[in-house]
Regions:
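A bilobed periplasmic-binding-protein/Venus flytrap-type ligand-binding module shared by bacterial periplasmic
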Residues: 127-137, 255-268, 291-292
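Short, well-ordered beta-strand elements
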Residues: 39-53, 71-76, 163-167, 276
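Ligand-binding pocket segment of bilobal, Venus flytrap-like solute-binding proteins
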Residues: 86, 92-99, 165-241
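An extracytoplasmic/periplasmic, membrane-proximal ligand-sensing/linker region
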Residues: 53, 173-189, 193-210, 271, ...
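Bacterial signal peptide processing site
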Residues: 23-26
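C-terminal motif of bacterial Sec signal peptides marking the signal peptidase cleavage site
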Residues: 18-21
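A conserved helix-loop-strand patch within extracytoplasmic ligand-binding domains
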Residues: 113-166
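Short helix-initiation/N-cap motifs at beta->coil->alpha
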Residues: 49-52, 72-86, 191-202
Length: 320
């Protein structure tokens, strides 16, 4: 889900890795290990970024690491840049769903050499502006950004200062939306819902009650199977059109989501590293596990167990 660090928040974390993303474990806290012995795997420190798709990735990787490889897995709930800082301290071994972040790759892989790439996850990531299905059906032209100002007054809220509201999610997700609104000269204001859960609920209510909502959203996302949001066409993305964050006036690219590990972990010989490197699945796979967690209210471990037992062939290919 849109996953870039907002520039203004980075400074909060530069003095240490004690902040958390979702009220989860602080770095340094241990979660329970698996049923297997730690064996040659030892401790595997896995960052968990604050969206349910990532939580699904982490649940499955942690389950396999614990139950098949005998690792002691420590999950650490962290926002993105904070997790990358942990590569250099040894407090984070892996980030298993990275959305682009060329800036962080340059800083931590190229310059500091504390991190390394570990291949793609197999997931294709989309970010954009979406409206509920009822709205796209009632006003088909609303899915073209050129027509948004015509409807701006319909999207006004008490928080949007007389303009149309463009709803974003977790404030830690870096989006291009404020720059897009400005550079496309739209009569809208970006307002943050506060979390992925709040964003989903806003779209769910909008579809149920025929409310006017337009907002930032992303795929893969299990919620799309419940409410198939319709993407608004923004000016076409072309390589380099988003190079200057303040001048962005184009759509988001398609992201080939990938995995990042600490340089030390990559050279450790740990079977957990091989698991991370070999881990790959589809958007449908992720959405299935995410739905178990978010909708069916299963624990991450129970959700992972259910998926692993139904997809043993895929799992065996990761640990062969």
């Amino acid at each position: 889900m849109a996953r870039h660090w907002r520039a203004g928040a980075v400074g909060m974390a530069v003095l240490g890795l004690t902040l958390t993303a979702c009220g989860g474990a602080k770095v340094g806290d241990d979660s329970a290990g698996g049923s297997g012995s730690s064996g040659k795997c030892g401790t595997f420190n896995l960052a968990v970024n604050p969206w349910v798709g990532y939580e699904a990735d982490a649940a499955v990787v942690a389950y396999v690491a614990e139950h098949d490889l005998g690792c002691k897995v420590t999950k650490k709930d962290l926002k993105e840049e904070i997790a990358w800082q942990g590569f250099g301290t040894g407090e984070v071994d892996a980030v298993i769903e990275n959305w682009g972040h060329d800036d962080l790759k340059k800083k931590y892989i190229t310059d500091q050499k504390t991190a390394a790439e570990a291949g793609q996850t197999g997931n294709k990531g989309l970010i954009g502006w979406y409206v509920p299905p009822w709205l796209a059906k009632a006003h088909p032209d609303i899915t073209d950004w050129n027509n948004l100002d015509k409807y701006a007054s319909k999207f006004k809220t008490s928080e949007s200062g007389g303009k149309g509201q463009l709803l974003d999610g977790d404030p830690s997700y870096v989006t291009n939306d404020e720059a897009l609104v400005k550079n496309l000269k739209l009569d809208f204001k970006v307002v943050y819902a506060g979390s992925e859960t709040a964003l989903i609920q806003a779209f769910r209510n909008a579809e149920k009650n025929k409310e006017w909502v337009i907002g930032y959203f992303y795929e893969p996302q299990w919620f799309m199977s419940e409410v198939p949001l319709v993407k608004v066409k923004l000016p076409e993305y072309k390589a380099g059109c988003d190079a200057d964050a303040e001048k962005v006036a184009c759509d988001y690219p398609v992201y080939n989501l990938d995995k990042i590990v600490s340089a030390k972990f990559a050279k450790s010989g740990s079977p957990a590293y091989d698991l991370v490197k070999n881990f790959t699945w589809t958007n449908d796979d992720q959405n299935t596990v995410a739905k178990y967690i978010a909708v069916d209210k299963m624990s991450p471990e129970a959700a992972a167990k259910k998926w692993v037992e139904a997809n043993r062939g895929k799992v065996d290919a990761w640990i062969k």
